[in-house]
Each structure stands twice: as structure tokens, then as C-alpha cells.
Amino acid sequence: MNKWLKRLTIGTAAALVLSAPALAEETARPNITAHKANGIVIDGKLDEWNLDSPAVVKDATQVIRDAMLWKGEDDLSATFYMAWDEENLYLAADVHEDTPLGAIEMLPIDGEDNIKLYISTDPSADPARTEYGTNDFLVYFIMDEGYWDTAIDRSMVPKDARQRFVSVGMDGGESVLEGYECAIQKTTTGFTWEAVVPLACFSNNKIEVYTPAVGDTLSCNFAITDIDYPCPGTEYIPQMAWSGTLKINTDPSEWGSVTLAE
């Protein structure tokens, strides 16, 4: 090997080694911290929340559906937060939206104004798994003031892994989360939303209730859907997600994660 070729080979190898950490950092799954709830009151205000670790959804690269209809951060963006205690998950969002709280009953539930929570209740689950498992859930929170329908989609969970926990509420018009509470406060740019969801909502007689603990890391993700309301405008409905692409609906490896802390 001549000296020039040898130097080129060594230089290329060095460049690859140096770029590897940057590539790993670029592709690392996003993570937030959920602190233990301390005096959280479900009133739509975020005064009692630790807001140090948000899941931010505001970039054009985070539009996963009908991107040509997304008109920027003021059209649709959100900052999500999570907290916990021994029996509940607490969720909050500061939503920027130009046509907030829009719902049309004839549309599929994924075409309504909604917030979607993707959550695993198994801290031992492989974050690189590409198939939903027994403890993976997709929860819909409909942003329709006065109704607040909810649903859980389990259609993507293989039948032998569902443990008889099937989809509920996907036709709309129901609140399927027993003990769920939510509230909003309207703002000049949209609204703030907060909610509490009992962990028992993700269990049945075959799936144990998850008992959270400091240090647990769970796969999770957030998405938000915006229908321009009223009609017309129902053919294309932009949707944004904290992490991943439309594959998040079938592939948990594209989710982010949340670590539980005091």
C-alpha cells in the first residue's frame, strides 16, 4: 500500500471513529424525567408542577401526518409533562393551537382534536422492541370541552399478548378510563391541560397493576392531533409526535422514554 493510500485509509477510519459518538447522540431516544407528584390539583393550571423536564413538540420534523397542512408552531405545537405517585400517572400539556378544542362526531377518533399517550407499564421491556407487548398501551384523550372522551387502542398488540385486554372506546362517545379526571385553562395561544389517570386503567385480571418506583424507566411517547374546526378541513388532519414517525402506532422502538424520580 503506498503512503498516500495508507494515510487516506487511516484518516477515513479516524473520521468514522470520531463521528460515531455524534451519530449515536443524534439517534438516541429522547428521555424526560417524571417527578413524584406533590400537591397537584387537577384544575388546568400547572402551578404545582415541576416543569424542568418537558417533552417538546414544535418542530417541522415532528409532524408525522399531513405535514403540508401544518402552518407552524402557532397552528399546532405542545409541551408535555408527566408526574406520578404510587397509584396514578399525571399528565400535563401546554398546547399552542389556533383552533383549539375541535371535535366532529362523525370522524374517526384519530381525526378528532386529541392528545395521545403511548405508554409501557413494564420497566423491564426492551426499548428496542419493534412489536407491541402485553404492557404497551395507546391512550386517546379527546380535546372536546364538556365531553373529554377517552379510548385505548390495543389493535396492534398481537392477539396472544393481549391477555384479554382489548381495544375500548375506539368508536368514540365514551370515557373508558375509570377514575380519569382532566381540566383545561384557555390561554391566548391555546390552552393548558392536565389530567390524572389511575394506573389500574392499564390492568385486568391477567395484567397486574404496575407499581411505580424511583429509578424506573418506561417507554413512552406523546402525540397531538389538530383538526381545523369547523368543517371543511377534515380530509387532511395534521398530527405531531414527540419521537418517531407514524410507525409509533405499531413500533415502540420509535418511542422516547420517561424516568421516574422523586
Name each model feature, range by range:
Residues 25-262:
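Structural preference for beta-rich elements and adjacent junctions enriched in aromatics
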Residues 11-19:
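Bacterial N-terminal signal peptides
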Residues 10-11, 168:
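General helical structural elements
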Residues 20-24:
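Sec/Tat signal peptide C-region and signal peptidase I cleavage site
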Residues 1-10:
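Bacterial N-terminal signal peptides that target proteins for export
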